[in-house]
Curated annotation (Swiss-Prot):
CRISPR (clustered regularly interspaced short palindromic repeat) is an adaptive immune system that provides protection against mobile genetic elements (viruses, transposable elements and conjugative plasmids). CRISPR clusters contain spacers, sequences complementary to antecedent mobile elements, and target invading nucleic acids. CRISPR clusters are transcribed and processed into CRISPR RNA (crRNA). Induction: Repressed by 5 J/m2 ultraviolet light and 50 mM NaCl, slightly induced by 20 J/m2 ultraviolet light, 100 and 150 mM Nacl. Member of the csa5-cas7-cas5a-cas3-cas3'-cas8a2 operon. This is CRISPR-associated protein Cas5. The gene is cas5a. Can form a Cascade complex with Csa5, Cas7, Cas3, Cas3' and Cas8a2. It comes from Thermoproteus tenax (strain ATCC 35583 / DSM 2078 / JCM 9277 / NBRC 100435 / Kra 1). The keyword Cell inner membrane does not apply.
Length: 226
């Protein structure tokens, strides 16, 4: 296995909670599948594959792609205006009246955080220059820049886990449950190691019933299936 701790920065990001529509609630941290999608897009930019094949290759390559809670973050709503029918009809509205009728709005939550850190575990080594091409974590406004990639062998440590884990793995701790898409796009119940206090999400922790490993600031369970 190959282990990476990725640090990304962004003005804001939004990964929509599954099963919501008009008010698009956002996860406080990116989902595993969003990270896999970002890696697949990076592989395409690097010329390693093309189109949907990149997503399939990324899904087969990644063992775990889990966000790590390392600091405070805040969510806030924003109103997004969209022009409907442009892609479907392959044309712009003919006039002002048509344009007004084609406009629609929705409320979407966004997240502000100083940095986003992600633990990535892969079956084969991924060149760091490919990881640094990861450019989006979420919707079309969720652009990020990868500023650091720590590659190394994790060491045995202890304490509470600070990455998202499957809820069945959690014994106790301070965390929030979310149903989200895992690395293969399947719906799973995850324990996110964050808790909301006064409108701000703060770092929590999850106690698991196995040995714990550390890579940089990421603390995660040993083995797989978590």
């Amino acid at each position: 296995m190959h282990y990476y701790l990725i640090e990304a920065r962004a003005p804001l990001y939004s990964v929509k909670v599954v099963d919501v529509y008009q008010v698009a609630s956002a996860y406080p941290l990116p989902t595993p599948h969003a990270v896999v999608g970002a890696l697949g897009a990076a592989m395409a930019h690097a010329g390693m594959c093309r189109g949907l094949q990149c997503m399939k290759e990324a899904e087969g390559l990644v063992v775990a792609a889990r966000p790590a809670a390392v600091g405070e973050l805040a969510k806030f709503p924003a109103v997004l205006w969209r022009t409907r029918g442009v892609l479907e009809d392959k044309s712009l509205p003919a006039g002002l009246e048509d344009y007004a009728g084609a406009r629609d709005a929705m409320v979407r939550e966004y997240v502000y955080a100083h940095a986003v850190k992600i633990l990535l575990v892969t079956r084969k080594r991924v060149p760091q220059h490919v990881i640094r091409l990861m450019a989006r974590l979420g919707d079309s406004e969720s652009y990020v820049s990868v500023v650091d990639v720590l590659e190394g062998k994790p060491r045995e440590c202890g304490g509470l886990v600070n990455v998202a884990v499957r809820a069945a793995k959690a014994r106790r701790g301070s965390y929030t449950l979310y149903r989200a898409l895992d690395e293969r796009g399947n719906r799973e119940l995850f324990a996110y190691p964050v808790v909301e206090e006064g409108g701000v999400y703060r770092r929590g922790g999850v106690e698991v019933g196995s040995k714990v490993l550390c890579l940089g600031e990421a603390v995660f369970p040993e083995g797989d299936g978590w």
